[in-house]
């Protein structure tokens, strides 16, 4: 960002900021269940259970994404949840679904939900990842590792272990893998968990987009995760880019240079982190011992720069998305104002003269608490005591920690702390001795298992999605296939079977619509959103649309009858001849007479 706006801001706060104080034209608690011919969008208000329709010239789909959940044994058990469910229950319902968690997926979502679970009081036993290396932003991974949560790469989840009455889970079977395929003989059991948090990626929720393109054509646009999975800033930029594109299509005067700038920023915001530095930059030894300073453990270039607005003395700069922040230690006075303003918690303050650390913290800790000082891998470097917690407005606080047995330049190795009683024990995995097979469900809406699909496929190496839908009902439940079809494609591809074609989005695209609601008992009021300043609303005795021979004649006789009609017409042509008498010659005397009388009436 060139000026501080959305960087470091939480997603829901970005939405509130963009919506503004005037909420006109924003309908909350409403879901689109279909897009009808004639560019009519069908909507239902979930609070009032009323159905209404919106007529529009342009459509922008910003429906976000849905979680992708791979198929594994017993994945229908209570205790197996996607990150979306875990987050919603924590953030909206203030409810923890479990206390001991296994997170599947070492990406940004896995890091974020694991971190939030820890904040809420849960214990994340481990994070497993099928890739040989971690994904996501490295600063997010460091934030989780500093809590001593182990991240196990090249591991996959094979099975959830149910309790005695199948009302929950007690463990999981995991295995080492290569190219996401489990290696036989490496299966092990992780016991003592009650929730499996599935964070294996997102897929665009694009069913409305597919149908919108069929109805609106080139006037259908998409923004945010509905078109490409990305961060909040990326969604904001794509929304602005879409708005400019629509304005240009409408013929409005816009700055094309602004459009190019936004487009470039949107592309830059999607880049993967690129490693620039091997180790963080530090001041000279003499400067370290002279006064306090900060260390920025941000080694990768990517689209994030709230830190460049954080220093009141202008000591932090970042020239582009492909560079890392730079600290001018001649300007840095060690005020640590920047420490709490980094969204990735990658800035740390030090005062070697007093053995003091200034560390970002986003969970409750008591002052005078004895803690373990840790590095980015959660390894214990020593002990310290929390002297003071400096509370900040963005809820990222700063803990002033006095190091007890780490001194001098060794302090700069410290990146965080863990309360001694919360430091986890080493992970204990048991070998898998006897396995009880369980069902692998592909479609949770209609309880379609992988075996059900394989029976239909037989010995073939391909099958159409339509045949699967017709024979198994997979993809015909409330989710309309947006979750189960991607799961099925992944599961069958591992067995050398390809699915041909894509499912056609079918209404209702929301499972919250009842058949009786399509014929409402009474007609509601009509609302017009004031997107234009040149429209007016008037009451008429009769409205005639079209000024051709039929329309103008109807206008004449209604006027003669005292109905006070109003006629609207888009262009000239027949109307010019029939209403205004604009043509000097008419093919029939009757037309000339109609034109004469109509002209007099007008």
Q: Where do the language-model regions lie?
A:
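Short, solvent-exposed secondary-structure boundary/capping segments
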Residues: 391-403
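Residues forming the flavin
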Residues: 1-292, 336, 414-441, 448-472, ...
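N-terminal Rossmann-like FAD-binding beta1-loop-alpha1 element of flavoenzymes
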Residues: 113-118, 538-567
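Short beta-strand-centered aromatic/proline hotspots
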Residues: 379-391
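Iron-sulfur cluster-binding cysteine motifs and their immediate structural context
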Residues: 305-326, 337-353, 385, 447, ...
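Conserved FAD-binding subdomain of flavin-dependent enzymes
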Residues: 11-26, 557-560, 570-602
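Glycine-rich FAD pyrophosphate-binding loop
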Residues: 1, 126-134, 559-576
